[in-house]
Regions:
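Conserved core of the sugar-phosphate nucleotidyltransferase
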Residues: 130-170
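Conserved N-terminal catalytic core of the sugar/cofactor nucleotidyltransferase
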Residues: 2-19, 26-30, 34, 42-123, ...
Length: 170
């Protein structure tokens, strides 16, 4: 795991990280396929994107508070690649319904274990730099969400219109 220079305070015992890692590899075809989707490709370095994402998550919370949200077709490749995560870290979608429903389902599952949980939701296929700034922002957001019952959203300014994704209006 890369070393972070971030101010790594003791993680809040109620902060959890969910990682959206479903997808069927259609948007990034032909490099990405249903059998080898983008999150299993080393696009931001020499390691698969899911590995990079889990390492970022481990800078925020211990492995037992990470949940990978995925489809059945990716369960085994993820378990092999992320062997440090416990079996309960992998939440397999009962049905593919999209981002909102899978996050709601994961939140319900986590809140059953920890009624005071604060969720940090990450995407498995994002390259993030600089790491220290990202980690500080995630910690600050989780703290604000916990203390003030806020929803904290991070977005980047778009470089072009993209109908395949949602958007946030200020």
């Amino acid at each position: 795991m890369p070393e972070s220079k971030s101010s790594s305070a003791t993680p809040d015992p109620h902060t959890w990280v969910t990682i959206l890692a479903g997808g069927s590899g259609t948007r990034f075809w032909p490099a990405s396929t249903p059998r080898r989707p983008k999150q299993l490709l080393p696009l931001a370095g020499d390691r698969p994107l899911i590995r990079e994402t889990v390492d970022r998550a481990r800078e925020l919370v211990p492995p037992e508070r990470i949940r990978i949200l995925t489809g059945a077709h990716l369960l085994e490749p993820f378990k092999e690649l992320l062997e440090e995560l416990p079996p309960e870290a992998f939440l397999v979608e009962p049905r593919v319904r999209g981002t909102g429903p899978v996050l709601a389902w994961a939140a319900r599952e986590i809140l059953r274990q920890d009624p005071n949980a604060v969720l940090v939701s990450l995407h498995a296929d994002h390259a993030i730099e600089p790491l220290e700034d990202f980690l500080d922002l995630m910690r600050e957001g989780a703290r604000a969400a916990s203390e003030k019952d806020f929803l904290f959203t991070v977005a980047v300014p778009p470089t072009r219109p993209e109908t395949g994704y949602g958007y946030i209006e200020p």
